[in-house]
Each structure stands twice: as structure tokens, then as C-alpha cells.
């Protein structure tokens, strides 16, 4: 099986704060499979580290109101194209991210409050009938 994984889950230091979300569960789950790492935010041209971003009324913004929506959408499209081109069967995504959140995202107030919703990349994957899993489902 070919599996795409949020790069931060495999230890890539691509999170907004320069860190990662390495998951031993993910590393074990993907052993023996063909793996493709993706970080839509990096693919969209955003630096590491970078200001935190949340989806505010459908637009990805920094806390000061600066829009980074174009970068998030560009990265999501590029990551989707990579997933499709590579013939990926499953995508494992980081929880709560404005790119990769599967079930919940932050509410746009930068208060740490979660609401039901999906990240930009996750929406594109689902619209293209690509199977996704939140890391918490492993």
C-alpha cells in the first residue's frame, strides 16, 4: 500500500513553531509500505518557523489578520497533485491543523478552542475521494 503522511508526524521539523509531531504509532503503522511525506504549508512556500494560522470565516489568517490563504491553498493543491500522481491509497494527517485537520480545527480566535471542521488539504482529499485518517485513529 502507498501511504502519504503529514511530514511532521514522521519527525520533519516543519511545524509552524519549527518542531515536529513525531508519532511512534505512525512510524510502526507505515513500516513495510511505500511512504510519501507531505507538508502542504511548506509546499505552499511558507517558512519554518512561521506565525500560527487559523481558518477565520473560510480564510487562513495569522492572528494579526494577515492572510496566508493563497499559500495554504497553493500548498494543498500541490500536495493533492503529488498524492494523485503517486497513486496514494491512504493519507495520515495531523490533527487540528488548518491544512490537515480531519475532524476538528481551531475556531479562528487563536484561543485554543476547537470546532468541528477540516483543514484545506483534507477538504481537497475528501473531495477527490482519497481515504484519510487522523493520526488519533491509529
For each predicted feature, which ranges?
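Short N-terminal binding/cap micro-motifs at the start of the first secondary-structure element
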Residues: 11-18
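Short, surface-exposed acidic-centric catalytic microdomains
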Residues: 21-61
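Short amphipathic alpha-helices and their capping/turn segments at secondary-structure boundaries
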Residues: 22-36, 75-90
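Short, compact, well-ordered microdomains
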Residues: 87-92, 100, 115, 120
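Extreme N-terminal starter segment of soluble prokaryotic enzymes
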Residues: 1-4
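Short, well-ordered beta-to-alpha junction loops that form the rim of enzyme active sites
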Residues: 8, 94-97, 137
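Divalent-metal-activated hydrolytic enzyme cores
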Residues: 43, 53-55, 59-78, 82, ...
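Internal, conserved structured core segments that host functional sites
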Residues: 94-105, 109
Amino acid at each position: 500500500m502507498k501511504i502519504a503522511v503529514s511530514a511532521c508526524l514522521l519527525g520533519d521539523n516543519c511545524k509552524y513553531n519549527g518542531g515536529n509531531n513525531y508519532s511512534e504509532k505512525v512510524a510502526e503503522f507505515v513500516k513495510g509500505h511505500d511512504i510519501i511525506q507531505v507538508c502542504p504549508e511548506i509546499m505552499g512556500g511558507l517558512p519554518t518557523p512561521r506565525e500560527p494560522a487559523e481558518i477565520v470565516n473560510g480564510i487562513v489568517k495569522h492572528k494579526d489578520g494577515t492572510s496566508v490563504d493563497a499559500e495554504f491553498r497553493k500548498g494543498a493543491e500541490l500536495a493533492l497533485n503529488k498524492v494523485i500522481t503517486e497513486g496514494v491509497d491512504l493519507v495520515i494527517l495531523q490533527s487540528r491543523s488548518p491544512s490537515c485537520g480531519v475532524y476538528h480545527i481551531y475556531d479562528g480566535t487563536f484561543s485554543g478552542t476547537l470546532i468541528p471542521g477540516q483543514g484545506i488539504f483534507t477538504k481537497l482529499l475528501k473531495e477527490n475521494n482519497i481515504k484519510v485518517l487522523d493520526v488519533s485513529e491509529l
